[in-house]
A protein has these predicted regions:
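Flexible, acidic/Gly-rich N-terminal and inter-domain linker regions that tether
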Residues: 1-32, 39, 378
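C-terminal scaffold of the Radical SAM
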Residues: 18-30, 48-358
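Local cysteine-cluster metal-coordination motifs and their immediate loop/turn environment
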Residues: 34-49
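An alpha-helix initiation/capping motif
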Residues: 249, 360-361, 390-393
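Short amphipathic alpha-helical interaction segments
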Residues: 360-374
């Protein structure tokens, strides 16, 4: 299970936004729709997801109708606040959204589009496990307005998939990608590196397999051991080795080199795309501080500097909405200093970087030291921007600390 919700102020039961919220209708608006169901809990995962035995009476078949109730609430709240505007991006995440019938995903998307509108050329992404994507599923999603499928490949090596508790076979990824392509969908694949027992050769095999798929976008994430997960307990008991930082660094450098050679450009520390048009616009909205409403249990939202998050369990979420109450559990409104620090954290991960002028004034002189250490690109700094080098990407957290402490 994921950890406790963040601290914050109580959220209004009717979901209303503060009257003094500085709404800017020019800021792009996105929607995140959380589908919290999984057949099996992966040993490394601490996301807010639930297997069938953990639902405590919540019914998967009722979920679409329940989430649409929150969409109706959001339409009223945003309309009252003068913040209603079309969605630039929509993202179905999880969990495993494709465990729901594709018709349910289509209903939720249609409800959101009816409530808020959908911008011309909007990006609509659905996350999927490879073994849940069939030609029929892909065609139904495409017909509903989905434009992009993000497929959880993670690895092409069977023993690595086993270490991660993934249920699909490597060959299922090709089947899923082909189904998505035949339906006219753009394709992104997710990889994880640094799993217990994974060698550099294993990782290279996964990169080769991912590149052979001819996808539009590849994400590669270092395995992080989260407290409370099965994998964390296995490491603590000495059953599996802890990931090696040095090996993970070697894996990242290999990924960057192989992806660049294949025509992919990095645009965020863990993300590469074949072209600017294939970047994840939804994730860029998060990193650039746009507005979004997160629907579903445990989902987080952000509008004009206000943040809130929903109750975590699907049963509690459904009970709140059945009582005509907002499912929000808490809210917070960070001050200007906190928002500046978060901006540094997020924008510094992007290839476009962050303007030196947007750093805390007392820390701007530190950029010279980061250049000398090979962490920040000197040419970008001349243009007034902080842009990470390859070494800087490997040590991104340390760079952020230097720029914000």
């Amino acid at each position: 299970m994921a950890g406790p919700l963040p601290l914050g102020d109580p959220a209004p039961t009717d979901g209303r936004l503060p009257d003094d919220l500085p709404i800017d209708p020019a800021v792009p608006f996105s929607a995140y729709l959380h589908v919290p169901f999984c057949r099996v809990r992966c040993g490394y995962c601490d996301f807010n997801t639930y297997t069938s035995s953990e639902l405590r009476g919540a019914k998967q078949e009722d979920y679409a109708s329940t989430l649409i109730t929150e969409i109706d609430l959001a339409e009223r709240v945003l309309s009252d606040a003068g913040a209603l505007r079309p969605m630039d991006t929509v993202f179905f995440g999880g969990g495993t959204p494709t465990l729901l019938p594709p018709g349910d995903l289509a209903r939720m998307l249609d409800a959101a589009a009816s409530a808020f509108g959908l911008s011309a050329g909007a990006e609509v992404t659905v996350e999927a496990n490879p073994d849940t994507v069939t030609p029929e599923v892909a065609r139904t999603l495409a017909a509903a307005g989905v434009t992009r499928l993000s497929i959880g490949m993670q690895s092409a090596v069977p023993h690595v998939l086993h270490a991660l508790d993934r249920t699909h076979r490597p060959e299922n990824v090709r089947t899923a990608v082909d189904a998505a392509r035949d339906a006219g969908l753009a394709v992104s694949v997710d990889l994880i590196y640094g799993a217990p027992g994974e060698s550099l050769a294993d990782w290279e095999a996964s990169l080769d397999a991912a590149l052979a798929l001819d996808s539009d976008h590849i994400s590669a994430y270092a395995l992080i051991i989260e407290d409370g997960t099965k994998l964390a307990r296995q490491i603590r008991r000495g059953e599996v080795p802890e990931p090696s930082d040095d090996l993970q660094a070697d894996m990242y450098e290999l990924a960057d080199a192989r992806l660049a050679a294949a025509g992919f450009d990095w645009y965020e520390v863990s993300n590469w795309a074949r072209s600017d048009d294939q970047r994840s616009r939804h994730n860029l909205a998060y990193w650039r501080g746009s507005d979004w409403w997160g629907f579903g249990p445990g989902a987080h939202s952000h509008v004009a500097g206000l943040r809130w998050w929903n109750v975590k369990h699907p049963a509690a979420y459904a009970q709140r909405l059945a009582a005509a109450e907002s499912p929000a559990a808490g809210t917070e409104r960070p001050d200007d200093d906190a928002r500046m620090l978060e901006q540094v954290l997020l924008l510094s991960r992007l290839a476009e970087g962050i303007a030196v002028a947007d750093l805390p004034p007392a820390n701007r002189a530190r950029v010279a030291g980061l250049i000398a250490d090979g962490l920040v690109d000197a040419a970008a700094a001349v243009r007034g921007r902080v842009r990470l080098t390859l070494r800087g990407r490997l040590l991104a957290d340390a760079v952020v600390r230097e720029l914000t402490d």
